[in-house]
Structures are given as structure tokens and as C-alpha cells.
Amino acid sequence: MIDPAGLATLGTARLRFATVLGAALLATPALAADAGHATGAGPGTGAGDARAWLERMTRALDTRNYIGTFFHVSGPRVETMRIVHRDRDGRVTERLESLDGAGREYVRHSDGRLICYFPDRHTVLVATRPNGAPFLGGLPKFGAGVDRFYRIRELPDQRLLGHRVTVIAVDPKDQFRFGYRLWIDRRTAMPLKTELRDAQGHVIEQILFASLTMPARIPDRDLEAHVPTSGVRWIVQRPAGEASAGAAALRPAALPPGFRLTVAGAQTIGAAHRPAEHLVYSDGLATVSLFIEPRPQPRAPAATVTPAPVPAPMRGLARFDSGFAFSTVVGGHQVTAVGEVPAQTVEFIAHSVRAIDGRASPVALPTVLSHR
């Protein structure tokens, strides 16, 4: 059975670890020395400047080479991590390593493979994300339709650690998503500081870089995992087409405004290798993972065999450091929605799951339920 608490790490890290990184970056003077990658003063002042800065930041995160060590602060938890990102002729390879505790690592290959190493669980998870975003790609970016659900505006420039920065506010228009603040370096377009904020404006997640460099070349050895793999259990996420027929028939009948299906995959869970479908819904910034897992069924015991107990289903809301998970049971399946979004978003999606034609597209609500 899927553990909602573990989904914050294994599910959204996600198989989208990027949203875990939707928070604050503090760069060091090494950034200012990046004269070879300087992109000029950037956009001036005007109505479209905030969007232009988000577009430049997105390009910088996608296409630059960079190596950094940062502190990820989420609730009371602080974790030190190191990221290596290389773009070689449009082929991106990345490695993300936890420098604390168990020493977990994540490697994203240019062929779409995402390999997650969990030495504390003696497990390696292999997923396929053909068009997967970079690990820092969960930071806000401007895309078609995003401004229907967020107010995007430029705030007065500031100075941060000796750098001139442009400050961008991304505020939600309804109760289904969180907001952001970003401090973007005007020379390199890299985000030097960001914040993920709740509806009350409280900062709920941060990342602070202790070092950040952008070398012209990154050798292959810097992108190789350092975790021993002898004797570990390998879990391979299967393509979406191999999901069980029962799981494929379950879909949200409705979604919060702006959310749509962006990724569909399947994996096996537990020693019994039960199939679990993994669906990702996004509005362009916020992301929710939906896991649909067949519930184990009790078997008629043999005369001399005591039947194994069937675990109780998970139901209700659970909070992790910077988001929520909501679990329920639909048609004999455990359904769990998890994401760095308000509680009502995961509840809405999980509660809307119905047995429908797997080919049908869930519809978004026609209007935003409330505005701030």
C-alpha cells in the first residue's frame, strides 16, 4: 500500500522532485563571476516584464550548466543537497544528492530515465519521463493560460548578497494553489531566492544555496550516482499502457480550474508487485500526483493455513512539510492525491475519482470557485 508520508519523497519527488525545489535560492559571489554566461541587464520596465523574467529564468534553468549546494527548508526539516545540471547540445543530464542522513540520490538521464536511489530502503526506483522537467524546473514559469489563475507582477528591484535582483510575485487567484516570490539575478537570470507561500502569505518552503557555479563543461563522472547498488531491490515504473484495466478505468470526473493531465505512468508496489497507476495533474505551476492502487482482496483460507490479514484502507487528510495528501477508496482501489497545494485541492481531486472510460478526459470546473 502506498504511504502518503512517503509520497512527499518518492511520489512527488516527487517522481517530480522539482516541486520540492519550489522555494528559495541564495547564490554566492561565484555567480557574479559568471561573465561568460552573463545575459545583459534583461527586460526593462513595462507590463510584460514579469512574464519576460520568468521566461528568461526558465531558459537559464533549462539550458545552463550549473553545480550548486543548497539547504532545502520545508517546515521544521532542513536538508543539505547538491545538484549538478548539464546541457550538452540540448541533451540534459542531472544528478541530485542528499548530503544528510541516508544520502539519497536522483539521476535524470537525457533519454528520459529517472533513477532514484534510496540506500536507507535498499531500493532503486527507475521511472521513465520522456519530457521530464529539470529538477529545478518546478520553479514558476510563464506559459499559456497560467495568468488566468495567477496574478504575475514585478515588484521594486532589490539587492541581495551584492547582486541586483528583480523581484517577481506570483499570487493565486483562488484557493486551489499556493503562491511564489522570486528574486532573479539581472545578469544571469538565475533565481537567487524564491519562496513558496500559503494563502496567508506565510513562507512554507525555501531553498538557500550555499554555493552556485556555472562551469563551461561538466564531466560524466560528476553525473554518476555514488550509491552502492549491490543487493538492492529495483522497482521499475512501467509505461502507462501496461496499467491494469481496473486502474485505467478510474479517473477524476472533474478537476479544479486550470488543472489538466500532464503525465501518466504505472508502477508496481510492494512485495506482491501490485500495479499502481500514477497520474500527474498540473495548472502549469502547481502539480498534484494521483496514485490509484488496487486494494488487496482477502482469499479463502486453506484448511490448514491462517489467512493473512488485509491491511485497513487509508482514508482522510495527511500533511507533510509543504503540502498535503488525501486518501480514499473508490471501486476497490486505494486512491491518494498528493502535492504541494492546499488541502482542498488534493481532497477535490481524490473525491472526484470515478469509474469512467479510461480514454475520457476529466473536465475542469467552468469557473473559479472563489477569488482573493
Sequence positions of predicted segments:
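Pro/Ala/Gly-rich low-complexity, hydrophilic intrinsically disordered segments
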Residues: 208, 219-241
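Acidic/charged, solvent-exposed loop-and-adjacent secondary-structure segments enriched in E/D, K/R, S/T
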Residues: 116-137
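Surface-exposed amphipathic alpha-helical segments
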Residues: 188-190, 197, 201-220, 331-372
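Extended beta-strand-rich segments in extracellular/periplasmic secretory proteins, especially
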Residues: 140-197, 202, 231-279
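Bacterial N-terminal signal peptides
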Residues: 16-29
